Amino acid sequence: MKSYTPYFMLLWSAVGIARAAKIIIVPPIMFESHLYIFKTLASALHERGHHTVFLLSEGRDIDPSNHYSLQRYPGIFNSTTSDAFLQSKMRNIFSGRLTAVELVDILDHYTKNCDMMVGNQALIQGLKKEKFDLLLVDPNDMCGFVIAHLLGVKYAVFSTGLWYPAEVGAPAPLAYVPEFNSLLTDRMNFLERMKNTGVYLISRMGVSFLVLPKYERIMQKYNLLPAKSMYDLVHGSSLWMLCTDVALEFPRPTLPNVVYVGGILTKPASPLPEDLQRWVDGAQEHGFVLVSFGAGVKYLSEDIANKLAGALGRLPQKVIWRFSGTKPKNLGNNTKLIEWLPQNDLLGHSNIRAFLSHGGLNSIFETMYHGVPVVGIPLFGDHYDTMTRVQAKGMGILLEWNTVTEGELYDALVKVINNPSYRQRAQKLSEIHKDQPGHPVNRTTYWIDYILRHDGAHHLRSAVHQISFCQYFLLDIAFVLLLGAVALYFIVSYVTKFIYRKVKSLCSRSTHSTVNGHYQNGILNGRYKGNGHIKHEKKVK
C-alpha cells in the first residue's frame, strides 16, 4: 500500500511557512537537558521561517546559533551557580536528606527568579516592543505564564518532561490513570488505587495552595492588569504539547488541544569517531553495554559508582561508560571510561546489548527509537515515572538506587541481555513510536503553526475550563436529585401514613358495628336510628 505520509508532511511544511512569526521561549532556570530540547525545536522553527528568542539569565551557557537569538536578564542563577545548586540537592538525595522543606526551597528559587524578571521594567518594556506572536511555556517553571500575561501574547505549553498535568483539564480516572510521581501503572489493585488517590490529592493541594499562590503574589506585587489568577492563566493555554508518546505512555483520556510530541531528539545513528568505531566493532562476540546517566553523571555518589563498577566488571560484554570524577577503584578491565560520548550513535550500533541509564526522558526515547533494552536507576524528577513505564512495557528493569546491591544490578543486566523478550519488546515499541505521521519535531512545528494560523485555536479547547467544580462533578445535579429523593420520601411516607390511618379507621368502625351477624349501628335492644327517629326491629329467632 502506498504511503502518503511524505505528501502530508510536505503539505504541512508548505502551509507552515505561509507566515513567519516571532516566538519567545521561556525555559526553566535549571536543567540543561530541557534547554537542549528547546534549541532543537528552535532550529526546526527557523527552517519554517520563524524567528525564535530565548529568555535566559546572564551567564547561562548556550551555544550561539543563527537559528535563534537571546534576550538576557540578571537572574538568580548562571550556569555555574545553578549547577552548584543542583549538586547540593543531589548530594541530599543520595544521603536521604532531601526533605519537603528543600523541595519548597527549589520552588522559592524559581519564584525569586520570576520576581526579578517581572520587576525588570527595562526588560519587560523591551519585550513588549518586540510584539511576539507566541510564547512557549515550560510548566516546570510557571513564570512563563506570568510573562505571557504581562506581554499580552498568546501562549502554548511545551512540556519537556513526562508530566501530564491535571491543569490540562482532561478526565483522569484514578482507577487506571496513575498520578505523576506515584510510580504506579494503569493496572492497580485496591491498595495501589488508594495510594494513587492519596498522591493525587496531595499533588492538587500542593499546586493549589503552595505553588500557584507564590506566583500570584508576584502578580499582585507589580499590580499586573487585567487581574487574573494563576489558575486561569494555566488553564488558558492554547495548546499542550507533551513530551510523551503512545509507545511509552499508558492509554488515557485526553483532549483535542493536547498532543504527544515525545522523541524530538531521536534520529538515525551517525558514523562514530574512528577510535570508538574500532572499539565497538571489536565487541562482536559478546557485544557491549552502554552506561550513561546524562547530565546526572556528575552527581553520582562514590558508593553508587562503586556498585556500578563492580557489577559491570563481572559482565562478559565490553562496557563503555560516560563518567567524570574519581575513577572507581574496582573498575573492571572490560570497562572504558569516557567524559563524553555520542550516545545516540552508540545506541544505534548493531553490537549494543543493553543500556544502563538514569531513566532521563531524552535518553529513554533514543533507546526506544533504536530498540535497545534498558536497566534504569532513576535519580530524581520524572526519571521514576519514565522507568516505571519502561518496566511495565517489558522493555527494561527498574532498580532503586538506595536499595540496589551490586549483585542485583549484575542480575538485572544479565537478564535484559540474555532474555530475548526485552529486546523484542524494545523493538516493538520502536516500531510503534516510528509508525506515526512525521517525526515528533515536525509534528511540534505543525501544531505551533496551526495555533498561529487559527489565532490560538480556541475551537480545540474544551468547555471544562469554563465550568465550576460543582458543575464538573455534577454536584448541583446530585444535590437536586438528593433533594427530590428526600421530598419524594416524605410525600410517599405521608400518603402511606394517611392511607393507613383511613384504612385502619374503616376497619375499626366495621368491627364495632357488627355483633352476632347483625348490624346495630350502636343502638341497643335492636333499635336503630334512621332519619332522626328511633325504630324497632324484631330479632330473628
From Swiss-Prot:
GO process terms (BP): cytoskeleton organization; galactosylceramide biosynthetic process; glycosphingolipid biosynthetic process; myelination; neuron projection morphogenesis; paranodal junction assembly; protein localization to paranode region of axon; response to immobilization stress
The chemistry this enzyme catalyses reads: an N-acylsphing-4-enine + UDP-alpha-D-galactose = a beta-D-galactosyl-(1<->1')-N-acylsphing-4-enine + UDP + H(+); N-(2-hydroxy-hexanoyl)-sphing-4-enine + UDP-alpha-D-galactose = N-(2-hydroxy-hexanoyl)-beta-D-galactosyl-sphing-4-enine + UDP + H(+); N-(2-hydroxy-hexanoyl)-sphinganine + UDP-alpha-D-galactose = N-(2-hydroxyhexanoyl)-beta-D-galactosylsphinganine + UDP + H(+); an N-acyl-sphingoid base + UDP-alpha-D-galactose = a D-galactosylceramide + UDP + H(+)
Transmembrane regions listed in the UniProt entry: 472-492
Pfam families in the record, alphabetically? Answer: UDPGT
Is the Transmembrane helix keyword given for this protein? yes
User: What GO molecular function annotations does the UniProt record carry, in alphabetical order?
Assistant: N-acylsphingosine galactosyltransferase activity; UDP-galactose:glucosylceramide beta-1,4-galactosyltransferase activity
Quote the subcellular location field of this record: Membrane; Endoplasmic reticulum
Q: What class of enzyme is it?
A: transferase
The source's domain of life comes to Eukaryota
Recorded metabolic or biological pathway in which this protein acts: Sphingolipid metabolism; galactosylceramide biosynthesis
One GO location term (cellular component): endoplasmic reticulum
Q: Name the EC number(s).
A: 2.4.1.47
What protein is this chain from?
A: 2-hydroxyacylsphingosine 1-beta-galactosyltransferase
Q: Which organism is it from?
A: Rattus norvegicus
